[in-house]
Amino acid sequence: MIILIPAYKPDESLVRLAQQITELDAHAEILVVDDGSGSTYVPIFTELAIRGVTIIAHPANRGKGAALRTGLAWAR
C-alpha cells in the first residue's frame, strides 16, 4: 500500500503523521510530494527521509493537484 501525501510548507505534524502511519502498518509505503516548500523546510523532509519516507520535490509550488498527479505518476 502506498500512502500519498502532498505537502507545502509542512511542520512537525507531518513527521508525527508519518510515524503514526508506520506504527499502524509497518509495510505501508509513504510518499510525500514537496510542492516547492523551499529551503526552510529541508529539515522536515530530511527527517521524513531518514524515517524511510520517499520524497519527491517540485522546484516551485504548482498546487495540490499537480502534487497529487506527480505522486500518482510515481506510484504507477
Where are these regions (language model features)?
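Cell-envelope/extracellular polymer assembly enzymes that use nucleotide-activated donors
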Residues: M1-I2, E29
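Short beta-strand/turn micro-motifs composed of small residues
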Residues: I5-A7, D34
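Short, well-formed alpha-helical segments that are part of the catalytic scaffolds
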Residues: K9-L24
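Donor nucleotide-sugar binding loop of glycosyltransferases
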Residues: P10-S13, S37, K64
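Short glycine-/acidic-enriched loop or helix-start segments at secondary-structure transitions
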Residues: L14-V15, Y41-P43, A67
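Amphipathic, non-transmembrane alpha-helical secondary structure
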Residues: V15-Q19, E29, R69, A73
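A conserved acidic beta->alpha catalytic loop
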Residues: D34-V42
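Conserved donor nucleotide-binding strand/loop of the catalytic core
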Residues: F45-W74
